A protein has these predicted regions:
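Short amphipathic alpha-helical/adjacent loop interface patches that line ligand
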Residues: 17, 50, 54, 113
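Structured surface interface patches that mediate subunit assembly and partner/cofactor docking
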Residues: 1-11, 16, 26, 30-35, ...
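Short alpha-helical hairpin
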Residues: 25-29, 84-89
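Conserved alpha-helical segments that form or flank metal/cofactor-binding pockets of metalloenzymes
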Residues: 43-88
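Hydrophobic pocket/interface hotspot
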Residues: 20, 46, 152
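A short small-residue
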Residues: 89-97
């Protein structure tokens, strides 16, 4: 975690938003219907999910440290149970979105995500939530958001038949670890795998070998 600086996380956060927009611009109308590594979502669904998540981050910051996410994590819910609850939340939020094309969702995501990024510096050291005795600050949660953008950039790239890797995967991994302590307790390390991007893809439930067929 010593590698993670405020400036580094904020720069990587902005890069994640930018690369999502760059990748989204490469999708044709037909390509938005393609499957993604997020097996339940096509590319257009993933665009909608990004829009929802960016808005959720605003809500969590508005209500910190008593947001609905903070209240859930304060119950010390297991990682598996948390994943199921968030999956249901994601599905409900996606279903409630207007039926618009993928580019419109991406534009809304970019506006919301960049606005969230501008809100982070003044609140950096404030408490965002607590999980099993670990206090997660707004800055640490920014690291989790940063990693989420880069992970979803990889999802979009793979849906296009391409690959993606952040410029500083070690920083992105460390940032995500700081913001998601619920995911790392007891996580086994695969022998011989010291690539931080590979580790993050696996830890986030992705198959690094996934390809668009």
């Amino acid at each position: 975690m010593s590698r993670v600086s405020r400036a580094g996380v904020l720069a990587a956060y902005r890069d994640g938003v930018t690369v999502i927009c760059e990748l989204a611009a490469q999708f044709s109308d037909a390509a938005w219907l393609a499957v993604t590594p997020c097996s339940e979502w096509r590319a257009a669904d993933l665009a909608g999910h990004l829009r929802c998540v960016a808005d959720d981050y605003h809500e969590y910051l508005d209500d910190a440290p008593a947001s609905r996410l903070a209240r859930l994590l304060a119950t010390n819910v297991s990682a598996d149970s948390l994943a199921r609850k968030l999956a249901r939340q994601n599905a409900a939020e996606l279903a409630a979105l207007p039926d618009v094309p993928g580019p419109e969702h991406i534009a809304a995501f970019a506006e919301s995500a960049r606005a969230y990024g501008r809100r982070l510096p003044p609140s950096w050291d404030l408490l965002h939530h607590t999980y099993r005795g670990s206090e997660v600050t707004v800055g640490a949660m920014a690291g989790a958001a940063c990693a989420e953008w880069h992970l979803h950039a990889w999802d979009l790239a793979r849906s296009l038949g391409k690959d993606y890797r952040p410029a500083d995967p070690e920083l992105v991994l460390a940032a995500w670890q700081g913001g998601t302590p619920q995911l790392w307790a007891g996580l086994p390390v695969e022998p011989g795998r010291d690539d931080p991007w590979y580790v993050l893809l696996l830890a986030s439930g992705r198959d690094p070998a996934w390809v668009q067929l």
